[in-house]
Amino acid sequence: MRGGNLKVLVVYDITDDSLRLKVAEILKDLGLFRIQKSAFIGEMTSQERENMEEILRRQNLGPSDRIDVFPICDRDLKMHSQIGRGKFGRGPP
Amino acid sequence: MRGGNLKVLVVYDITDDSLRLKVAEILKDLGLFRIQKSAFIGEMTSQERENMEEILRRQNLGPSDRIDVFPICDRDLKMHSQIGRGKFGRGPP
């Protein structure tokens, strides 16, 4: 979360409960904000993004598991909509 | 999915099974592609996006439910990463 202005959205679909919790912990530890049970958003440098993806790739994902990392520019983030009042954590968006 | 070049990612966190399934059906019917159990992506005009959000707002979401709609420009979509081999449906990304 230091420097850089690359915002990334990380969304995952992981079947195993303990692995799913582990991935959530990894993302929290990397300074991302939780916006949904399985979605985090954060700001990081390209190098930090690479490191994060390397850590995520090392996890023992099942055959139907998937993690998607989307960079989102500020312009797009401004056009984000939230429907429903569910709230996780703090911070953007 | 006709015209326009606004790509949107829709990610949701809905507790009730039947409502979650209903939202998935709505998004499929609107022509979006499923990329995860609770994430769809599609291309639509601004008007189609407004209509979609209006339909989603009419659903009886619970207090902790939340649907996030992120426009994603082509430049950002190109920098998208997928980790894991889980695959839903067809189409981008």
UniProtKB/Swiss-Prot annotation, chains A, B:
Organism: Korarchaeum cryptofilum (strain OPF8)
Biological process per Gene Ontology, one example term: defense response to virus
Record function comment: CRISPR (clustered regularly interspaced short palindromic repeat), is an adaptive immune system that provides protection against mobile genetic elements (viruses, transposable elements and conjugative plasmids). CRISPR clusters contain sequences complementary to antecedent mobile elements and target invading nucleic acids. CRISPR clusters are transcribed and processed into CRISPR RNA (crRNA). Functions as a ssRNA-specific endoribonuclease. Involved in the integration of spacer DNA into the CRISPR cassette.
Keyword presence, tRNA processing: no
Lineage: Archaea, Thermoproteota, Candidatus Korarchaeia, Candidatus Korarchaeales, Candidatus Korarchaeaceae
Cofactor(s) of this protein: Mg(2+)
Full protein name: CRISPR-associated endoribonuclease Cas2
Keyword Protein biosynthesis: no
Subunit structure: Homodimer, forms a heterotetramer with a Cas1 homodimer.
EC number(s) stated in the UniProt entry for this protein: 3.1.-.-
UniProt-listed InterPro entries: CRISPR_associated_Cas2 (IPR021127), Virulence_VapD/CRISPR_Cas2 (IPR019199)
Homology family: Belongs to the CRISPR-associated endoribonuclease Cas2 protein family.
Binding positions (Mg(2+)): D13
Highest taxon above the source species: Archaea
GO-annotated molecular function: metal ion binding; RNA endonuclease activity
UniProt keywords, alphabetically: Antiviral defense, Endonuclease, Hydrolase, Magnesium, Metal-binding, Nuclease
Pfam families: CRISPR_Cas2
HAMAP family according to UniProt: Cas2
